[in-house]
């Protein structure tokens, strides 16, 4: 009887899991008149790391001229937009105004009918200008990542009094560098970290910020330390080795930094949040703090195994943040990581959940000053 009960329970669990994935069919029935007949169309959203040219989310054109795409998603809330392969070619309103992220609340199989009014690159706009402040400079447009045999643009923010003093400063290493300082290079809005540092740096300890650009179509791979069925080999382990063994020594040699753990931090959002959490687990003697913003733990759930195995060795400051409007798994996953770390780690931690928070750069921009002030508290 016990054996039968166990088998029945296993069967019910298997059935439940099989039904937790729903079929979602996107159908684009109307496109701008300017649309090319050979357009490659993609959906980018919170379910694929907002990759604007993800080949796994590529629409197929049918004989009637409409485009369709079928995917599987779990129960939850998702945001997305349609692109032609880049954020410069994202859908917009007919007059060129940006549109809000499309929203999907999923609890069963569904078909979504879409109409695209216009593409952003078809609108004549004033040229975008750089918003990076005078204290931001580019270290290298092609900094070598020997661990991955690739190059990357690396930028740095130096405190306003850097050239006038001989002080040494803490260093924060940030992911998705395109979005950190400059609206010109951002794909979904900038964090305005340089403006934040300029405005509140005088009220607390100032800090050097190093921003490393993401790798475009390699972003998910570089920011995930685990192999993925959908996206392929995880390269996060090598990427973090680059930060610790290549970039940090260069920064410490080239600038007046406080080199020790107490003054070395890392931060990022979404996939950048995942890799920041992994970094502090892998190198607990290097990173004294981490900003884990809206972490994409669902892409790398193995992070919880690493927390269990390595979390006890971490004694740092960790700022967990997520929004309650980021889907069904974001808040539970973030709170789980926080809770599991509290059980085994002596780290100083906080978990912030914003009721109206969405998976968006502007939300992280608003949260960054609070993270910075908390990080600099004695």
Describe the role of every protein-language-model region:
Residues 23-25, 32-75, 85-106, 140:
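Aromatic-rich carbohydrate-binding modules that target alpha-glucans
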Residues 167-177:
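Short beta-strand element of the alpha/beta-hydrolase
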Residues 1-24:
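Bacterial Sec-dependent N-terminal signal peptides
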């Amino acid at each position: 009887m016990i054996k039968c009960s166990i088998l029945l329970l296993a069967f019910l669990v298997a059935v439940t899991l099989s039904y937790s994935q729903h079929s979602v069919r996107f159908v684009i029935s109307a496109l701008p008149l300017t649309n090319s007949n050979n357009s490659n169309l993609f959906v980018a959203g919170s379910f694929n790391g907002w990759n604007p040219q993800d080949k796994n989310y590529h629409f197929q054109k049918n004989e009637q001229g409409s485009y369709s795409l079928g995917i599987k998603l779990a129960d939850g809330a998702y945001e997305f937009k349609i692109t032609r392969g880049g954020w410069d070619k994202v859908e917009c309103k007919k007059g060129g105004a940006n549109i809000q992220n499309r929203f999907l609340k999923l609890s069963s199989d569904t078909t979504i009918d879409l109409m695209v009014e216009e593409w952003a690159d078809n609108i004549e706009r004033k040229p975008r200008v750089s918003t990076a402040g005078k204290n931001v400079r580019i270290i290298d447009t092609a900094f070598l990542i020997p661990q991955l045999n690739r190059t990357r643009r690396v930028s740095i923010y130096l405190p306003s009094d850097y050239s006038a003093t001989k002080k040494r400063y803490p260093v924060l290493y940030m992911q998705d560098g395109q979005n950190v300082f400059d609206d010109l290079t951002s794909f979904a809005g900038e964090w305005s970290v340089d403006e934040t540092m300029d405005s509140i740096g005088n009220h607390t300890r100032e800090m050097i910020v190093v921003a490393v650009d993401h790798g475009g179509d390699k972003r998910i791979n570089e920011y995930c330390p685990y192999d993925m069925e959908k996206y392929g080999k995880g390269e996060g382990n090598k990427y973090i080795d680059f930060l610790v063994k290549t970039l940090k020594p260069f920064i410490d040699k080239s600038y007046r930094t406080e080199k020790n753990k107490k003054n070395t931090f890392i931060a990022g959002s979404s996939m950048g949040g995942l890799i920041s959490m992994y970094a502090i687990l892998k190198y607990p003697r290097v990173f004294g703090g981490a900003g884990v913003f809206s972490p994409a733990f669902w892409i790398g759930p193995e992070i919880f195994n690493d927390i269990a195995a390595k979390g006890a060795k971490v004694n740092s400051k960790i700022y967990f943040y997520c929004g309650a409007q980021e889907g069904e798994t974001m808040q539970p996953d973030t709170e789980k990581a926080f809770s599991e770390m509290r059980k085994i780690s002596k780290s100083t931690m906080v978990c912030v959940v914003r009721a109206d928070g969405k998976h968006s750069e502007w939300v992280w921009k608003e949260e960054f000053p609070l993270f910075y002030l908390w990080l600099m508290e004695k």
